[in-house]
Amino acid sequence: MAEAMDLGKDPNGPTHSSTLFVRDDGSSMSFYVRPSPAKRRLSTLILHGGGTVCRVQEPGAVLLAQPGEALAEASGDFISTQYILDCVERNERLELEAYRLGPASAADTGSEAKPGALAEGAAEPEPQRHAGRIAFTDADDVAILTYVKENARSPSSVTGNALWKAMEKSSLTQHSWQSLKDRYLKHLRGQEHKYLLGDAPVSPSSQKLKRKAEEDPEAADSGEPQNKRTPDLPEEEYVKEEIQENEEAVKKMLVEATREFEEVVVDESPPDFEIHITMCDDDPPTPEEDSETQPDEEEEEEEEKVSQPEVGAAIKIIRQLMEKFNLDLSTVTQAFLKNSGELEATSAFLASGQRADGYPIWSRQDDIDLQKDDEDTREALVKKFGAQNVARRIEFRKK
């Protein structure tokens, strides 16, 4: 997996298909993720794959929880979060039932050697669980890496004890703080890319914290920041600070998100386009009218640059959506790209996983088809998205 990432452009970003969690009928799979350190990252992977994330449990949604959560396993209604990681790693949609959490799964595993002894088989697994150290699962590893990324204030934090004691108190895993520290230092440090997690100091705010730690190690290594943060709200405030402090970094991430969405196998792919948020007040020209556009007009439109007030307004809207849905910048910009920069459609998509008009979201393959000079392909797109949405997509791509 690491070798495949070396061939890509960004090992820290999602690389799986944008339709991984889209059903054959074009509808998006809906997921509910229980609060955990990995929730934000899982949400990013799900949304990048075309799925949707519910803020509360909804009918028809796939309920996700980390293995070892007593309430989730007792109900039998939850699917392991490992399902998302495995789907992303293999880049294919796997069978849900194979990842269902429940007391029966542990009992079946422990009683395979003695299928006939019900009374003895039911009693034996419990002593075996506590006879030695509890094995680390992939979900545990993700929780550790995510917790370090979101709570470590300096490189020296991971070698101290305060960080790990705080993680043990949070009850995110069943392991002691000594085991958590040992697991990270000996097996996980530097392996973030294998779990599709970036290194901690990747954002401007993280860089600022790192510089502050070098200037004042004692203040950076204090336990106070850990006490002020909660696992249910990972880095929300830090994302806001990052955008406010460095708008250039935001613009760069917008371009990166665009490139990620627009990347195709052919060499004739068009130049990167910026996100233009529109309220859809005016109806765009139809595909037929658009085809009559003069070349000179197209060149003039391409040469137009976005003004600073427009950039500021776009950043403000994106920040509001990030705060409203508790998502990262890349996920929100991807949603805008998939909805042709339409604010209303993007908001509806982030809230419910569907556009308000009932049409599907745009994928990279749809954009490739849109570039083809083929009447049948264009008619198929009009049938799929509606003539007005196709016209809006054409206008959006020009910008």
UniProtKB/Swiss-Prot annotation:
**Cellular component GO terms, alphabetical:** chromosome, telomeric region; cytoplasm; male germ cell nucleus; nuclear body; nuclear chromosome; nuclear telomere cap complex; nucleoplasm; nucleus
Pfam families hit by this protein: BRCT_2, Myb_Rap1, Rap1_C
Low complexity bias (residue ranges): 112-125
Function in brief: Acts both as a regulator of telomere function and as a transcription regulator. Involved in the regulation of telomere length and protection as a component of the shelterin complex (telosome). In contrast to other components of the shelterin complex, it is dispensible for telomere capping and does not participate in the protection of telomeres against non-homologous end-joining (NHEJ)-mediated repair. Instead, it is required to negatively regulate telomere recombination and is essential for repressing homology-directed repair (HDR), which can affect telomere length.
Gene giving rise to this polypeptide = TERF2IP
Q: Which residues form the BRCT domain?
A: 78-101
**Reported tissue expression:** Ubiquitous. Highly expressed.
Record has Ubl conjugation as a keyword: yes
Organism in which the protein naturally occurs: Homo sapiens
Any coiled-coil ranges, and where? none
Swiss-Prot/TrEMBL GO biological process terms: intracellular signal transduction; negative regulation of DNA recombination at telomere; negative regulation of protein phosphorylation; negative regulation of telomere maintenance; positive regulation of canonical NF-kappaB signal transduction; positive regulation of NF-kappaB transcription factor activity; positive regulation of non-canonical NF-kappaB signal transduction; positive regulation of telomere maintenance
Q: What is this protein called?
A: Telomeric repeat-binding factor 2-interacting protein 1
Q: Which family does it belong to?
A: Belongs to the RAP1 family.
> What segment(s) does the record annotate as region Disordered?
104-132, 196-244, 264-311
Question: What molecular function does GO assign, one term?
Answer: telomeric DNA binding
- Residues in cross-link Glycyl lysine isopeptide (Lys-Gly) (interchain with G-Cter in SUMO2): K114, K194, K208, K212, K240, K372
N-acetylalanine modified-residue sites: A2
Q: Which domain of life is it from?
A: Eukaryota
